[in-house]
């Protein structure tokens, strides 16, 4: 599916997003609009409008008609709009950074272990497709061998947390799988939704590659999507040595098992209810709920420390885990072995040899409508930014966003907070007790503008020349270890969840904070 979205509509969308998260966040966004560092299209350009169209008849055509007529979606993209166009502009700077650092590494002009060296080394490994061709699927061979050796479902379940960690590599989109495991559920650190001063463990449903509706739907689209998926899995399994008949049989087994998982999964609309999805309990109670899953072992495999029976876990979907436990017991071991083989391969395809990458892109064409694969340099620049985001971001803001602009933005946000405080205190319909609560929340409101005051320390991240797969695995494990180390402690409210070049903004209700990366503080959104 491809989509055209003009600057005019995207600007409106951004304001809606801001208002949904926080009225103050939207006001802040508008206030910093004067801080854009470079020229770009106007937020509202009348030349994009088709004024021959009556706005009350077709407002979309009225607002964007001429823009839609004058723009086409590039063959390497699924959509086109202001977010993506500004993102491309930001990514050009990222590409320059990673290429420059790779040249420094090549010429021996940067010291090993520095951020520049790690950026350049990671990027160079991603660009080194010759090494990937020689390796084939050898990087995941040890993982596949462990699955092949399993004799029982117990053997499979015991390794749910280990599969994808020991040698688990890069995700299908270029992001690291290392550290995530390949279980049909997700367990990881999360700020306690009812106590934002501590990080606990959250357990959630998972294990699906398609949308739940694609597995269960009876319509033409869902039926076709399942057929396309079976073809993709079949072709992929053939690449790791299965015969065409074996691969086809395994692909159907995998679809059937994932469909069973989809049936017991809670619909996403229901998963949005914060009250219905809060079930905090000690690990011992969670273990009783899932006797066929060694959850304590899983946590330890994932990197959790000091795991005891009292370890706090928020089980977001108890009914799912109860049903999953029964499904695990009832499903033959060979079905689980096929499932894990496929998920191990799928998680690593972007980091393996050409046939794997080409099949991954063919599937992307089927699901997104993209016609041409992005240039390798663009893919690797994005992957490097994903792996070393704040190291890249530190250089990005040096080139593209001044400290003075950040200071002015922060000052404007402070002024808006003061204005909102005055407005709250002046409301005649609000009780004094409520005003005290509202001002208290406002005073605790954390504003993150442009980029972090303190950059992430990558000194313990061991990037090495050579294998792109290994580097993605190391990044995934490093991030996982950092996250698990926070359990039982207060969340680090100074840490950002987005990198400086990101074209986005967010509000966290649990942490009461906004983020406006420098990447979005530019035209056409802010001028």
Q: Which residues make up each language-model segment?
A:
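Bacterial N-terminal signal peptides that target proteins for export
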Residues: 5-25
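Bacterial Sec-dependent signal peptides at the C-terminal "C-region" and cleavage site
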Residues: 33-40, 177
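Short N-terminal segments immediately surrounding and downstream of signal-peptide cleavage
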Residues: 38-54
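Active-site-surrounding "flap" and adjacent substrate/cofactor-binding loops of secreted or lumenal enzymes
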Residues: 53-58, 62-131
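Structural recognition of the beta-strand scaffold that forms the well-ordered cores
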Residues: 58-62, 200-202, 513-517
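Short, solvent-exposed loop/turn elements at domain surfaces
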Residues: 67-71, 210-211, 524
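Intrinsically disordered, low-complexity linker/terminal regions across diverse proteins
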Residues: 87, 254, 260, 288-293, ...
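Noncatalytic, helix-rich "gating/capping" subdomain that lines the substrate-entry/channel surface
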Residues: 101-411, 415
């Amino acid at each position: 599916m491809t989509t055209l979205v003009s600057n005019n509509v995207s600007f409106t969308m951004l304001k809606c997003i801001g208002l949904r998260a926080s009225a103050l966040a939207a006001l802040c966004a508008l206030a910093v609009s004067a801080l854009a560092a470079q020229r770009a299209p106007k937020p509202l350009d009348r030349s994009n409008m088709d004024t021959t169209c009556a706005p009350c008849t077709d407002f979309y055509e009225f607002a964007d008609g001429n823009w839609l007529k004058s723009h086409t979606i590039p063959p390497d993209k699924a959509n086109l709009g202001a977010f993506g166009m500004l993102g491309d502009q930001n990514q050009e700077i990222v590409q320059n950074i990673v290429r420059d650092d790779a040249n420094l590494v090549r010429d021996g002009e940067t010291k090993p272990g520095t951020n520049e060296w790690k950026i350049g080394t990671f990027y160079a490994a991603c660009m080194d497709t010759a090494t990937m061709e020689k390796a084939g699927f050898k990087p995941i061979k040890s993982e596949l061998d462990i699955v092949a050796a399993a004799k029982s479902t117990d053997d499979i379940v015991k390794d749910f947390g280990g599969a994808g960690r020991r040698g688990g590599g890069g995700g299908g989109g270029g992001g690291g799988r290392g550290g995530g495991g390949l279980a049909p559920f997700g367990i990881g650190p999360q700020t306690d939704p009812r106590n934002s001063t501590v990080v606990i463990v959250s357990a959630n449903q998972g294990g699906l590659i398609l949308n739940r509706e694609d597995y269960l739907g009876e319509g033409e689209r869902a039926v076709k999507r399942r057929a396309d998926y079976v073809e993709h899995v079949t072709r992929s399994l053939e690449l790791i040595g299965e015969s065409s008949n074996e691969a086809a049989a395994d692909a159907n087994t995998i679809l059937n098992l994932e469909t069973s998982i989809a049936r017991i999964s809670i619909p996403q609309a229901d998963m949005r209810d914060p009250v219905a999805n809060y079930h905090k309990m000690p690990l011992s109670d969670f273990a009783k709920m899932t006797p066929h899953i060694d959850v304590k072992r899983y946590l330890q495999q994932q990197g959790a420390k000091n795991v005891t029976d009292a370890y706090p876990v928020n089980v977001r979907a108890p009914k799912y885990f109860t049903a999953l436990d029964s499904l695990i017991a009832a499903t033959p071991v060979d079905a689980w072995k096929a499932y894990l083989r496929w998920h191990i391969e799928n998680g690593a395809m972007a980091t393996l040899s050409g046939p794997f990458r080409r099949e991954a892109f063919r599937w992307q064409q089927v699901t997104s409508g993209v016609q041409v694969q992005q240039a390798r340099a663009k893919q690797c620049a994005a992957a490097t930014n994903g792996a070393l985001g704040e190291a890249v971001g530190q250089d990005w803001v040096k080139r593209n966003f001044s400290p003075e602009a950040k200071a002015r933005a922060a000052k404007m946000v402070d002024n808006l907070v003061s204005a909102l405080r005055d407005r709250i205190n002046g409301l005649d319909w609000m009780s004094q007790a409520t005003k005290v609560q509202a001002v208290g929340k406002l005073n605790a409101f954390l504003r993150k503008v442009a980029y972090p005051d303190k950059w992430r320390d990558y000194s313990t991240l061991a990037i090495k020349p050579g294998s792109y797969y290994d580097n993605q695995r190391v990044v995934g494990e490093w991030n996982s270890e950092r996250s698990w180390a926070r359990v039982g402690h207060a969340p680090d409210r100074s840490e950002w969840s987005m990198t400086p070049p990101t074209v986005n903004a967010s509000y966290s209700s649990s942490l009461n904070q906004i983020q406006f990366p420098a990447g979005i503080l530019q035209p056409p959104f802010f001028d």
